[in-house]
């Protein structure tokens, strides 16, 4: 089987935590690699963002990333990419003609790629699978203060994808409900395939390894560490974490506490790092906040291990891969009760779930784990067993099976309703 994966707006080879690169990059990269290990030939098509990028990157014997020229390499925001959908599609078609390659199936990721997948399905007459990753209707119902609503044009495009895709892949049952309630989707076109974590890479460290990670970050031995990993944007809630920590320190001024925020600015403006630094100064906690540049997985392990707690105060997450990775490293998680996070975190066992984004409520939850060593240690010991329930191998196996079961293009109505 040969699969064309479409990831227009961000490459799986980009560093997560910068620009538009995040959980979706991790998802596409790991799923593609695991499918290739199962004998599937995968070509991932993405938009070239650098002139010397090289059109084709051979990642593995049966996995390539193809950088398609569509518009200027730099200067286009994600919001402007719809103007390049035709150019991107044309680049894919030109590549396929030149290579003499054809595909058995298309799998698009995010709504921009979905529009391309829709056209290619009708041209190639092969089944088309789509994974949304995020939905405008859901994001608009859970905006952070200062965030702009997703445009109606995006919601319309998503509706077209839902109405026409042969199969929709979602992370959780909550996403099934989101598609039904927000887009009038039919369950016969939806299947749930939870994502995973690289549980071979993200593992608990020895006491010595943890001490080494803390030394590298310049954190004193007895200081409690709260970590945050992800793109720096309001949607991810780092500002909520800073306000909660300020309140926690007001309540317990003698507590030795450090906040480690690992990620780069993302979204319109690109100056969220400066805003967060200014907020930390205004709150009087800049002395205990460290900002780290995004790190590759082999270095990110050390950040997770150095943390006593990882906070995921997102306004919405379709799943929450950071939460899984942290737990796999033996670090309990405090996360918002939203989207897929109640699945990613076993509330009360591997971490705590918080309703909403009131800094006082977050200070309560963080304080429980900062001040109660026994509770925090018990949750950290349980966390890896919860994370182990989710693996990329299992995700790819389930996805591969669904690929093979798909009827010819345009016949999704013949499928049986999801059980």
Curated annotation (Swiss-Prot):
Entry binding sites for 1D-myo-inositol 3-phosphate: 9, 20-25, 78, 110, 134, 154
A GO molecular-function descriptor: magnesium ion binding
Pfam family, one: Glyco_trans_4_4
Catalytic activities: 1D-myo-inositol 3-phosphate + UDP-N-acetyl-alpha-D-glucosamine = 1D-myo-inositol 2-acetamido-2-deoxy-alpha-D-glucopyranoside 3-phosphate + UDP + H(+)
Keywords of the record: Glycosyltransferase, Magnesium, Metal-binding, Transferase
GO BP: any one term: mycothiol biosynthetic process
Top-level EC class as recorded in UniProt: transferase
Enzyme Commission number, as recorded: 2.4.1.250
InterPro entries registered for this protein in UniProt: Glyco_trans_1, Glyco_trans_4-like_N, Mycothiol_biosynthesis_MshA
Extent of the signal sequence: none
Residue positions binding UDP-N-acetyl-alpha-D-glucosamine: 15-16, 23, 231, 236, 295, 317, 325
UniProt keyword tRNA processing, yes or no: no
Ligand binding (Mg(2+)): 304-305, 307, 331
Role: Catalyzes the transfer of a N-acetyl-glucosamine moiety to 1D-myo-inositol 3-phosphate to produce 1D-myo-inositol 2-acetamido-2-deoxy-glucopyranoside 3-phosphate in the mycothiol biosynthesis pathway.
Family from the record: Belongs to the glycosyltransferase group 1 family. MshA subfamily.
Subunit structure: Homodimer.
HAMAP family, sorted: MshA
NCBIfam families reported in the protein's UniProt record: mycothiol_MshA
Protein name: D-inositol 3-phosphate glycosyltransferase
Naturally occurring in which organism (per UniProt): Corynebacterium jeikeium (strain K411)
Gene: mshA
């Amino acid at each position: 089987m040969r699969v064309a994966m479409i990831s227009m707006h961000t490459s799986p080879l980009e560093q997560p935590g910068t620009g538009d690169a995040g959980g979706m990059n991790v998802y596409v990269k790991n799923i593609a690699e695991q499918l290739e290990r199962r004998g599937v030939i995968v070509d991932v098509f993405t938009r070239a963002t650098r002139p010397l990028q090289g059109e084709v990157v051979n990642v593995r014997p049966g996995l390539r990333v193809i950088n398609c020229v569509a518009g200027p390499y730099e200067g286009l925001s994600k919001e402007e990419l719809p103007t390049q959908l035709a150019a991107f599609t044309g680049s894919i078609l030109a590549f396929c003609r030149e290579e003499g390659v054809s595909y058995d199936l298309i799998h698009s990721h995010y709504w921009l790629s979905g529009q391309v997948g829709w056209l290619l399905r009708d041209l190639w007459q092969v089944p088309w699978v789509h994974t949304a990753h995020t939905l405008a209707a859901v994001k608009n119902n859970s905006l952070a203060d200062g965030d702009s609503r997703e445009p109606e044009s995006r919601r319309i495009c998503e509706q077209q994808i839902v109405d026409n895709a042969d199969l929709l892949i979602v992370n959780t049952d909550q996403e099934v409900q989101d598609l039904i309630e927000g887009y009038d989707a039919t369950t016969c076109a939806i299947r749930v395939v939870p994502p995973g974590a690289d549980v071979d890479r993200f593992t608990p460290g020895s006491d010595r390894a943890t001490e080494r990670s803390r030394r590298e970050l310049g954190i004193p031995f007895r200081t409690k560490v709260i970590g945050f990993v992800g793109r720096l944007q309001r949607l991810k809630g780092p500002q909520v974490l800073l306000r909660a920590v300020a309140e926690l320190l007001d309540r317990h001024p003698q507590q030795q506490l450090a906040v480690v925020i690992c990620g780069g600015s993302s979204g319109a403006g690109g100056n969220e790092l400066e805003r967060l630094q200014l907020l930390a100064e205004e709150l009087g906690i800049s002395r205990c906040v460290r900002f780290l540049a995004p790190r590759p997985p082999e270095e990110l392990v050390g950040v997770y291990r150095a943390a006593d707690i990882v906070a995921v105060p997102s306004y919405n997450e379709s799943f929450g891969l950071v939460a899984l990775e942290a737990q796999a490293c033996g670090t309990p998680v405090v996360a918002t009760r939203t989207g897929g996070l109640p699945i990613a975190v076993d509330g009360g066992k591997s971490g705590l779930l918080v309703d909403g984004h009131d800094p006082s409520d977050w200070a309560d939850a963080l304080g429980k784990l900062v001040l109660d060593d026994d509770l925090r240690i018990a949750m950290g010991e349980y966390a890896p067993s919860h994370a182990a329930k989710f693996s990329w191998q299992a995700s790819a196996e389930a996805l591969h099976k669904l690929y093979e079961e798909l009827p010819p293009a345009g016949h999704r109505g013949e499928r049986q309703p999801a059980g």
